[in-house]
A protein has these predicted regions:
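Extracellular glycan-modifying ectodomains
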Residues: 1-339
């Protein structure tokens, strides 16, 4: 079955045969779900450019040699890192060996707004991701509560400032910022000023690795500047297209957002890539937890024991924290209901 990058290479080759390549400079953007925002931002900044996006999100039949030959016809090639297996013959490192001038794009990863988010990579299935209501993104609190046999109501009671504080969720920001800036620096970009601006404007991530569109636009501008290309003055909000938001949105919890002067929510958005057919689905906290529990109930405990669960399970204090905060919150709710 052909993947997105297979189709794109066939499209580009067909267009070249017909002599329909127009625009300069010729720019190629290679990468995952973040690549559309980068490519779109570059087109806004250099409207006369010819820009193609080569999406690498699924395994295809294209060989690395064919990809490199296709990309070799462009004036500038920008690429996010990708692992071997998506393209036959290698990954990012092998592509660099064939195309030494390929410019790296930093992967936008930031956990400061989403310290509770984890992946569940099933160790019994070679690390295959367990999908829940929000795709591969899961709540560590919800998963641990399930593993301890808590009810949905008890789990809802856990979500609040006391447990977040005890788990260190308010202490993640600085490490996340440093890791993000280190990734950018590895691509010869200084995005420190951009990070400050994004942080002041509000939560700038839909999940820990899905940035909002204006973030990718700013990264696109930084990449073009690094490449020595002149960009046009443009207000992104006048032309904003956000491809990533069609996927899941893992909310920034209110208690976490408020720490940084913003407003959060417990509204979980499910993915919907067919907007012409339906509007989509959102879950409140209760529905999200119930949906997650229904998924976890179909798996063996060993399939759900990701590193954070192993660490928490090995620490008796974490179990006591969960039991205490669930009971305390439920007691306070009951007392308030009697008033």
């Amino acid at each position: 079955m052909l993947s997105e990058i297979d189709h794109q290479i066939l499209h580009v080759l067909g267009r070249r045969l017909l002599g329909r390549d127009k625009g300069a400079p010729r720019i190629a953007v290679v990468g995952n779900c973040q690549s559309f925002g980068i490519a779109y931002g570059m087109k806004l900044l250099i409207p006369q450019a010819h820009i193609d996006r080569f999406t690498i999100v699924r395994k295809g039949v294209t060989t690395l040699d064919r990809l490199a030959k296709t990309l070799g016809r462009y004036d500038h090639v920008f690429s996010l890192e990708f692992q071997p297996g998506f393209v036959r013959g290698g990954g990012w490192e092998e592509l660099k060996a064939l195309l030494p001038d390929v410019a790296p794009i930093p992967s936008i990863v930031f956990s400061g707004f989403h310290p509770d988010t984890i992946y569940i990579l099933d160790p019994t299935r070679g690390g295959y991701p367990v999908e829940g209501p929000t795709g591969p993104y899961h709540s560590a609190i919800a998963l641990y509560a399930f593993l301890r046999g808590m009810s949905v109501e008890q789990t809802i009671a856990l979500f609040g400032e006391p447990l977040f504080e005890a788990l260190g969720y308010f202490d993640v920001w600085q490490d996340s910022a440093r890791e993000f800036l280190d990734l950018a620096a590895a691509s010869d970009l200084d995005l420190s000023a951009e990070l400050v601006r994004w942080s002041r404007s509000g939560p700038f991530m839909y999940s820990m690795n899905h940035p909002k569109a204006h973030v990718l636009f700013d990264v696109a501008k930084a990449l073009l500047t690094r490449a020595g290309l002149n960009t046009a003055p443009v207000e992104f909000s006048d032309f904003a297209v956000d491809d990533i938001v069609r996927g899941v949105v893992f909310p920034v919890y209110p208690e976490i957002a408020e720490r940084y002067g913003h407003r959060g929510s417990y509204l979980f958005k499910r993915s919907n890539y067919r907007l012409s057919r339906n509007i989509g689905q959102f879950d409140d906290l209760a529905a999200y937890i119930a949906g997650s529990f229904a998924v976890y109930a179909k798996h063996q405990r060993a399939q759900l024991m990701v590193p954070r669960m192993i660490d928490w399970d090995a620490n008796p204090e974490v179990g006591r924290l969960f039991a205490f905060h669930a009971a305390d919150a439920l007691t306070r709710r009951y007392a308030a209901a009697q008033v």
